[in-house]
């Protein structure tokens, strides 16, 4: 069997890293002797998470543009040029059959270099509103795997395939894990469990909200699992002294925490939205306003338009959060409707479908 080679690039947050790892795992399961190399951004979380998953990674000195004038922005052109030069070296030395980008600081440089060198590229666009980098790269990409319908205004229609976003395979069957989850997190089986998710790095405004309202929330006879993110863990750790509250910087067993959850309060990054659709939990999305193209609001709105979630903007939290949360908590029919509707939007075979497209691309080149 021919030994295929693949470069995967994506990072900065878990939402870009875990889809890339899921794709790598599926490629490895189909082609056990294939070679896989990751390219990420130095000092970002992929430099730890990818080796933990068993793959080699090279780091580029690249970071995104800030929204205000900073020294980092002044350095951006030099870092971009340096990353392009280093990407040339990496791609030419490794000689991949296909380069796959899942978003993040490094993937733009690697995909650009691959397309210049005539190497096949696949973009995995996770959001309902693509960023400028992927829009530019799409002109030369061979395939664009998307997670939302109606993206023809951004990408060439003949290159697009609706696949969904890769999610951890252990999330596909969480329904039967509730008892295990209750034991694992030492929960009270008679109380509703509220899961607070701020993404891998944490969400400052959601953390502030929960800290302010925690006594009121607990008065609703619920228990709380609060993933505050590694950036904020020390600030909010003291709340773990309260009864029925667990504070976690990061959650390793997402399958069990979803199985335990009755209601989820979450950011609406692409991976979070895809995971919540797979597990089918009633969710209140609080999008981050501090992301490119306001894509989190657009991701959440795409689900709300199908009656699959509730959307609260950060500007609405002080005036509306209590009413919205209490109304949902006390309305079993509403919870069931949201669960049913969001689950209908799930694309559980995304990883397999993306790898199918990658293999078609490889085989078309060899023929």
Curated annotation (Swiss-Prot):
Membrane topology: Peripheral membrane protein
Catalytic activity: di-trans,octa-cis-undecaprenyl diphospho-N-acetyl-alpha-D-muramoyl-L-alanyl-D-glutamyl-meso-2,6-diaminopimeloyl-D-alanyl-D-alanine + UDP-N-acetyl-alpha-D-glucosamine = di-trans,octa-cis-undecaprenyl diphospho-[N-acetyl-alpha-D-glucosaminyl-(1->4)]-N-acetyl-alpha-D-muramoyl-L-alanyl-D-glutamyl-meso-2,6-diaminopimeloyl-D-alanyl-D-alanine + UDP + H(+)
Ligand binding (UDP-N-acetyl-alpha-D-glucosamine): 13-15, 127, 168, 200, 251, 296
GO terms classed as biological process: carbohydrate metabolic process; cell division; cell wall organization; lipid glycosylation; peptidoglycan biosynthetic process; regulation of cell shape
Record keywords: Cell cycle, Cell division, Cell inner membrane, Cell membrane, Cell shape, Cell wall biogenesis/degradation, Glycosyltransferase, Membrane, Peptidoglycan synthesis, Transferase
Domain of life: Bacteria
The enzyme's E.C. designation: 2.4.1.227
Top-level EC class as recorded in UniProt: transferase
Pathway: Cell wall biogenesis; peptidoglycan biosynthesis
Subcellular location: Cell inner membrane
Stated family: Belongs to the glycosyltransferase 28 family. MurG subfamily.
Function: Cell wall formation. Catalyzes the transfer of a GlcNAc subunit on undecaprenyl-pyrophosphoryl-MurNAc-pentapeptide (lipid intermediate I) to form undecaprenyl-pyrophosphoryl-MurNAc-(pentapeptide)GlcNAc (lipid intermediate II).
This protein's name: UDP-N-acetylglucosamine--N-acetylmuramyl-(pentapeptide) pyrophosphoryl-undecaprenol N-acetylglucosamine transferase
Source organism: Flavobacterium psychrophilum (strain ATCC 49511 / DSM 21280 / CIP 103535 / JIP02/86)
Lineage of source species: Bacteria, Pseudomonadati, Bacteroidota, Flavobacteriia, Flavobacteriales
């Amino acid at each position: 069997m021919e030994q295929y080679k693949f470069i995967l690039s994506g990072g900065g947050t878990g939402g870009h890293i875990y889809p890339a790892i899921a794709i790598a795992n599926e490629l490895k399961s189909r082609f056990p002797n294939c070679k896989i190399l990751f390219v990420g951004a130095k000092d970002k979380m992929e430099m730890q998470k990818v080796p933990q998953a068993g793959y080699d990674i090279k780091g580029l000195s690249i970071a995104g543009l800030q929204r205000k004038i900073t020294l980092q922005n002044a350095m951006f052109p030099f870092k971009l040029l340096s990353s392009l030069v280093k990407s040339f070296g990496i791609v030419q030395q490794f000689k991949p059959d296909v380069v796959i980008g899942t978003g993040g600081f490094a993937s733009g440089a690697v995909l650009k270099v691959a397309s210049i060198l005539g190497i096949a590229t696949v973009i995995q666009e996770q959001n309902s509103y693509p960023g400028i980098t992927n829009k530019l790269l799409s002109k030369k990409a061979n395939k664009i795997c998307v997670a939302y319908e109606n993206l023809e205004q951004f990408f060439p229609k003949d290159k697009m395939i609706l696949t969904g976003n890769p999610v951890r395979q252990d999330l596909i069957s969480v329904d039967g894990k509730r008892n295990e989850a209750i034991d694992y997190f030492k929960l009270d089986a008679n109380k509703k469990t509220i899961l607070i998710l701020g993404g891998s790095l944490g969400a400052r405004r959601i953390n502030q909200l929960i800290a302010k309202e925690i006594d009121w929330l607990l008065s609703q006879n619920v228990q709380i699992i609060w993933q505050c993110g590694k950036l904020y863990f020390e600030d909010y750790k003291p709340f773990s002294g309260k009864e029925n509250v667990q504070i976690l910087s990061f959650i390793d067993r997402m399958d069990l925490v979803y199985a335990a959850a009755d209601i989820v309060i979450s950011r609406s990054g692409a991976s979070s939205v895809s995971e919540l659709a797979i597990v089918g939990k009633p969710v209140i999305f609080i999008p981050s306003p501090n992301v490119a193209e306001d894509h989190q609001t657009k991701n959440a709105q795409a689900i709300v338009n199908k009656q699959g979630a509730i959307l609260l903007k950060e500007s609405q939290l002080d005036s509306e959060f209590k009413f919205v949360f209490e109304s949902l908590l006390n309305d079993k029919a509403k919870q069931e409707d949201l669960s049913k509707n969001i689950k209908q939007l799930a694309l559980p075979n995304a990883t397999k479908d993306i790898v199918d497209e990658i293999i078609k691309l490889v085989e078309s080149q060899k023929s």
